[in-house]
Amino acid sequence: SPPGNWQKADVTFDSNTAFESLVVSPDKKTVENVGVSQVAPDNPERFDGSPCVLGSPGFRSGKHFFEVKYGTQREWAVGLAGKSVKRKGYLRLVPEERIWQKGLWWLG
């Protein structure tokens, strides 16, 4: 655990917001990109242009950390999004779009 007053974020993912190729586990603690579209109702909360899913709780302040297990995936990202983040259409993963993220991409 990190030094100081950092708190581990106990994240629960919201399957109603999940992009079509993201599958949220039944316990809502993990997300997997299966690479193919899943049947999911279109709703205003769902991301339809970028592989994103929202989780809770939200934070307004403090120091929080996440534990990420990415297995054998060559590409992954984890981050924070503002509650009012755009859900429809392509989303650039940059602070100007209310997204702050870290990840690994293979550029080869």
Curated annotation (Swiss-Prot):
InterPro entries: B30.2/SPRY, B30.2/SPRY_sf, Butyrophylin_SPRY, ConA-like_dom_sf, PRY, TRIM/RBCC. It is found in: Secreted. GO terms for cellular component: extracellular region. Residues 1-108 form the B30.2/SPRY domain. Pfam families: PRY (PF13765). The keyword Secreted applies. One of its GO terms (molecular function) is toxin activity. Expressed by the venom gland. The keyword Secreted applies. Keywords: Neurotoxin, Secreted, Toxin. SUPFAM superfamilies: Concanavalin A-like lectins/glucanases. Neurotoxin that produces dose-dependent hypolocomotion and hyperalgesia in mice. May directly act on the central nervous system, as it is 6500-fold more potent when administered intracerebroventricularly than intraperitoneal. Belongs to the ohanin/vespryn family. This is Thaicobrin. The lineage of its organism: Eukaryota, Metazoa, Chordata, Craniata, Vertebrata.
